Structure formats: C-alpha cells, structure tokens
Amino acid sequence: MLKVSKRYYGFQSKSPFQLLPDFRLKCGLEIHTQLNTKFKLFSFSTNDPFHSIDSPNSNVSFFDAALPGTQPILNYEAVIDAIKLSLALNCDINANSQFDRKHYFYGDQPLGYQITQHYSPISSNGKLSLFENIDNIDQSQKDIGIIQLQIEQDTGKSMYDDSKHFTRIDLNRSNVPLIEMVTKPDFTDLKQVRSFIKKYQNLVRHLKISSGDLETGAMRVDVNLSINDYARVELKNLPNTSSIVNAIKYEYNRQVEIIKNGSADELLTSPETRSWTGVKTVKLRSKETTIDYRYLPDPELPRVILDNDVITNISNSIPTLPDELLSRLISKPYNLSMKDAKILVLNSNGQNEMYTQEELQNFYLKVFDCYYNVVGEKLNHKLPVNWIIHELIGSLNKLELPLSKVLPKLSPEKFSEFIVLIHNKEISNTSAKLLLFHVLNQIKENDHSIREINFDSLIEEFELKPATNASKVDLTELCQTIITELNNEKLLNDIISGKKKNSIQYLVGLGMRASQGTLSPQSLEETFKKILQVKW
C-alpha cells in the first residue's frame, strides 16, 4: 500500500473556505500606490510608466539611471498628493518629515538604495472606516487603523529571458513616486480585506492621485497574516483582488493544518515571506535571512517642513469624500437606493469613455435640483436617476457619444425640463425614450438645425403627446382587437388565473406599440384587466 506523507507547504482543501473560531485570523495590508504626477519623484522625467511599455528606457533621466554626480530634486506634487490621502485617511500629518536611504543591490535599482521615509514618514495614526450598508461587511462598522503613509521611489522593471540567460532592465518605472500605506493587523475576515481594498482604490481615484489599478501595478498589495498570535507571514506577488483573497484562504488553511498536526512550534515560530504562485504559497525567505537595509537619512535631500496654512489649503481643496456623498444621496431629498448612489459615486476605473464619474455625478445633482424646484414635494425620486443612468447613459454608449459633447446643448437645466414633461405625463415613457435618442443622435451628427432644444416643440412636431382624449370605446376596441388577434388562450388563462400576472405587461406593450406610445400604460392595463375580468 502506497503511503503519501503530508507536506504542509502544499496543503489544499477541497471543502468550502471558512474561518474557524479556534483559529483566529489576524491580518494587515501594505499597499504601494503609484502617484499620477506629471514628473517623477526626484527628477524631471515624464511620469508615464504604462504608456511607455513599448519604448523601454525612453523616460529616463541621468538621476533615474544613477549616473555619478546627479542629485535628487523633490517633486512637491507628490508631497501634496500624499497630504491629500493622509487627510482623507484621518492621519496625523508630520510637519517635519525626512527622506532616508534603504540600501540593497538589485539590477532594477541602479542607485544601490531606495529613497523612502523610514524614520520620519509624512503621516501616521489614521484610519479608514468600513460600514455594513456601504461596504457589505458583516459588522455595522469596522475601523481599520493606518500605521503610517510614506513617500518613496518605485524601482525599474526586470524582464527575464530564460532561453538566453539574461535579464533586460527597463528604467521607465524607476523613480516613479509611490505612497506606501501600512495598516494595523485589524482585519479579521475576508470581506473586510476585499472591501478595504475596493474602498481604498476608489478613494485614490476620487482624489485623482492614482489610477489605483492592481492589474497594471499602479497599486500593489502585500498581506501580513498570522493565526493565534504565531509568527507573522508576509504574502507577496498578489496581482489582483482574487489573488489576494485566494492567497489568504490558502495560507490560513495551511497554517491551521500545521497547528492541528502539532507542528506549529517547528514551522510557525519565525516570521517568513512567501510568494503566491496562483495555486499555493511558497517560501521566499525567513527572518534569519532578512536583509539588513542599513537605513540612514539621505544627506542630499532637506527635510520636508510644512506650514499650517499649507495643510489647511490642501484640506480645503479635497472634494467631498465618497462616504459622505453616499450618505447624502440615500437621504432626503434624493432618497436613492444604495445601488444607484454607488453608480454615481464609486469610480471603478473600468470607466465608460463616454463620461467621467465627476461629470455624471454633477449632472445628476443639477438635474435633480432643477426638477425639485419645479415639482417640489410631488417629485418622483427615481425619475431623474433612472433616466440619467439607464436611458441617457445607455443612449450615449450606443451612439458612442461623450457626455461632454452633449452638455453644451443638453444642459442639466434642459434635461430637467424633459424630466418634468415625463413627470407631468405630457409624454409617455416609450415616446420619451425615442425622443431622447433622436435628440442625442442629432447632436452627434452636428445637426446645426438644433440651436436650442425645445422638447415641447419636438413633442408637437412628432405628435408624441399622449392621447388623453381617447374615448373609452376606442380604448376598449383597441384592447379587444389585440386580444382577438393574439389568439393565445393559454397566455390569457395564465393572466386571468394569476399564474403569470406579469404577462399582462406583454399585452400592454402590444397596446403601446399599436398606439405608437400615445396611450398610457396604466389605462391600457386597466382596460385589459376589465375585458379579461381579472380579479387579482
């Protein structure tokens, strides 16, 4: 009989993942975020590491390449971005920070050291709060502590060619400004980790300091975790959120198995760094082989000293933060669902090229205010958001027409007039959709005949006004004709019995089509129910 021994480093569980009460997860994150400044951190090279991928070493200054005699010149745009993020994370700003040298040798780090902020970082002692209704965590609120934020250089990029046994070095990324953010080990489940990463991504995008993309490397996450206060394990090589979550699951199960089998004192007492392969974690190094980085203050860079008015001015420039915007939109007078509010506020960065998040958000707020000023407390809260998110944006996508090109002719004030017409039932939803698409198509084709959009005139021109004076006899005859020509006894019986109540909307749709959208869906539904003698 073949006996296979267990190998803890290759442990995999086929059962659904769960955190066990006797094995407490303790987890923290280190997140490196590339800043989208115009220039690099300590040189005047263009900061464009992604668009220059096909042109290696094209954005490299003498300092980036560490040529002898070159000296760093601090890009203060990176400092401003770091202060913005620090304030958004409720950190204490260090008014007298410094840069330090972290010494190590690697091919893509030509200086022989990285300039960072080890001893006196730009900020510390902050927090980012997660909420049940916003972030879909299991607790009503969970505060994740921020130990510190520090400004530092990114490295170059190494590309290995195993077949030719050499390495190519691209220094376009060298000296790109980074913010390293280190959290406290406050995460106790995977939902919190996933939600925090998503929230942090949206925050840096909202502040316009980074794209926050994990896939491109603009944001890179390392995980520190331990179980039951055993030694900390650092996980690296985590290119996206699913990798982060799967690596934590695997490492948790691996360590639980070690503890259960009584090998914790042998295998979990020394801190170590492990890499995620996509399937499992593998050991890179242990504490005994940890590099001595020989930190020391950089003698070529002065301390960064901030006056109080600098911090105040930067604070005043920060836009309203996402959580505050969401809370505002789900409250009176907007009363949006959290789902709709998130569409307006949260920036996925997989953004449709037809609009920016800020454009969409501002457009909605102005449309709503104009609509509310006209109809007052009689407003339909869903009307503006539905017509903007679904109909307007849907049509823009279909026509490949940017919102910015539409705004000069279809301003929020003008669009609110359109919403008021729908509110007052001066045009049916079906006709309104056709009219909106027509107007947008004319704008796309640069039809100069549309100098100013007049929805009332267009409704008159295309005879889109609802047939409010249609007699009950005409309406009954139309509905009876539709039922007769449909000749579908099973469908009618399902409607009458209540087995398929929603099927009556199919009849309403036929009525709307036959009347070219001039009859109201409500009157059609009432008439169909009366003819069919529906009791429900």
Curated annotation (Swiss-Prot):
Coarse class of the protein's main subcellular location: mitochondrion
Q: Which UniProt keywords are given for this protein, alphabetically ordered?
A: ATP-binding, Ligase, Mitochondrion, Nucleotide-binding, Protein biosynthesis
For this protein, the Enzyme Commission number is 6.3.5.-
User: Which reaction is the catalytic activity of this chain?
Assistant: L-glutamyl-tRNA(Gln) + L-glutamine + ATP + H2O = L-glutaminyl-tRNA(Gln) + L-glutamate + ADP + phosphate + H(+)
SUPFAM superfamilies tied to this protein: GatB/YqeY motif, Glutamine synthetase/guanido kinase
Describe its function.
Answer: Allows the formation of correctly charged Gln-tRNA(Gln) through the transamidation of misacylated Glu-tRNA(Gln) in the mitochondria. The reaction takes place in the presence of glutamine and ATP through an activated gamma-phospho-Glu-tRNA(Gln).
Family, as annotated: Belongs to the GatB/GatE family. GatB subfamily.
Name this protein carries in UniProt: Glutamyl-tRNA(Gln) amidotransferase subunit B, mitochondrial
The species is: Vanderwaltozyma polyspora (strain ATCC 22028 / DSM 70294 / BCRC 21397 / CBS 2163 / NBRC 10782 / NRRL Y-8283 / UCD 57-17)
